């Protein structure tokens, strides 16, 4: 089938390169180190964020490969939670539960859990999540590492989240976790798996082929590429040399709103496919300052009028797609951006992002609200050991995205699986975030506050006001005079308090109490949601319910 050609082609390339470097790598190297990735979870990364921020040249493209951060992450985490030399206690509360190792191989495995009970005030319902799964990772020899995880879930969510999941836009897609099916009357049943094979071809090249997510930036959110959406197949090639790190990412996405059957397209079945080729070039300007350049192209695999099939031109590994796009008279969706990070002191750093979907410089200067001036920015600040209190971190962030950014006239928008590939709010929003995180020994506490303003579409109105990236931008409200929060202006104040006790740092297994207050006000609705829960969970993954 033609929609599989992209990854069949990439897998053939990967397998040839893999086996070539496999034998040459074993011949020239007798060192053993894991090429597995650090988890993307914000909570997990609070354990090591300060060390990574100050001692790693390149921290933007995530998940970070363990050996690329110049730190022994496992030792750092273990040292922070050591103190009991009892073998059984050490195994249960510090390390993976299953360990198989030899001179040139290592396999680790642990269960993944999220057993949660809660209560929500609007519907006056008891909420719960029942997650069971596993994680397995390891290495064979000095070049090959692997990772796989699987979780199966049943959940009843608080009212605001349940309502969003059931909207036609989301169509039963659980944020970041795939499509669910009905579980009894008001719950969802859903599952998620991920995995990859990692190969260190040399001191300069690392290849990863698998099914997962990525994140570009140093903040809580990303405007370039985030782990907000569901997993996807990918090929990642990371090149590191001197003051440069260059990453190629090729991915396949699905459009759940376009189901192609044998009746209307004889050689396609299932959901419509689209592909992304992305480049990220990071340069270390100094010991304190790092700058990154990002670009991506998304194109469709659909042989209808005005659409492209698989286009080998976008396998070009060299940065700057615009000349390629122009040379083939492309109607595809291109995004470019910058990310910056500056270490102010050994305890603090500034970071920023700038994203351009498309814009006209003359219209931008005239400030007349031209609809196609589609851009956004992020600016953030982190301060570690605030007030000289060890492990107290302050995190501030602002995000701003103009209407219609990331959207397109066809399904080559910047989305996957009914979700946004960048920010969960889509476009036409501003957001201010404050996070205070504190850890002492195994005690883990966090306070998070978000102030959000966005302009949404009106129910029953076919006009797009620029928030929903899946809406055709040709159905816009006007060409000029497009201001921020165009449409149904909505305000959200979201506060979340978490108090936890870490049982095992390897999987960030913790007992956690959570209290959430969400206040939404708009022209049509006013809701005050209060939700609390207690859980036993492996907190390795980001689940973005804070919008």
Positions of PLM-derived features:
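Short, intrinsically disordered/low-complexity patches at protein termini
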Residues: 23-24, 169-171, 230-232, 241-243, ...
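Generic low-complexity segments that are intrinsically disordered, proline-rich and/or Lys/Arg-biased
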Residues: 1-4, 64, 169, 318
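Outer-membrane beta-barrel channel domains
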Residues: 35-290, 295-303, 364-375, 382-400, ...
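Exposed, low-structure sequence patches enriched in small/polar residues
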Residues: 33, 190, 284-547
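Bacterial Sec-dependent N-terminal signal peptides
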Residues: 1-37
